[in-house]
């Protein structure tokens, strides 16, 4: 269970880093918000899902 928690936490940290770097770059592109809206929303939804999954797994690990 600890290994699954660590992998999920690593995915959460990696996605957070990708969103912090990627969203401003996507919004600064010439097409901007219109072209990359779906990618930003799906990344944000996955991030929120990982927040809850990491929280739930944390209760099993500690």
Swiss-Prot record:
May control the interaction of photosystem II (PSII) cores with the light-harvesting antenna, regulates electron flow through the 2 photosystem reaction centers. PSII is a light-driven water plastoquinone oxidoreductase, using light energy to abstract electrons from H(2)O, generating a proton gradient subsequently used for ATP formation. PSII is composed of 1 copy each of membrane proteins PsbA, PsbB, PsbC, PsbD, PsbE, PsbF, PsbH, PsbI, PsbJ, PsbK, PsbL, PsbM, PsbT, PsbY, PsbZ, Psb30/Ycf12, at least 3 peripheral proteins of the oxygen-evolving complex and a large number of cofactors. It forms dimeric complexes. GO terms for biological process: photosynthesis; photosystem II stabilization. GO terms for cellular component: chloroplast thylakoid membrane; photosystem II reaction center. Belongs to the PsbZ family. This is Photosystem II reaction center protein Z. NCBIfam families: PS_II_psbZ. It is a multi-pass membrane protein. It holds the Pfam family Ycf9. The keyword Membrane applies. SUPFAM superfamilies: PsbZ-like (SSF161055). Gene3D superfamilies: Photosystem II PsbZ, reaction centre. It comes from the Eukaryota. The chain crosses the membrane at residues 8-28, 41-61. Keywords: Chloroplast, Membrane, Photosynthesis, Photosystem II, Plastid, Reaction center, Thylakoid, Transmembrane, Transmembrane helix.
């Amino acid at each position: 269970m600890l290994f699954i928690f660590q992998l999920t936490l690593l995915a959460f940290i990696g996605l957070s880093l990708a969103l912090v770097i990627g969203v401003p770059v996507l919004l600064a592109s010439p097409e901007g918000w219109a072209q990359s809206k779906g990618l930003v929303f799906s990344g944000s939804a996955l991030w929120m899902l990982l927040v809850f999954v990491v929280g739930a797994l944390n209760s099993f690990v500690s």
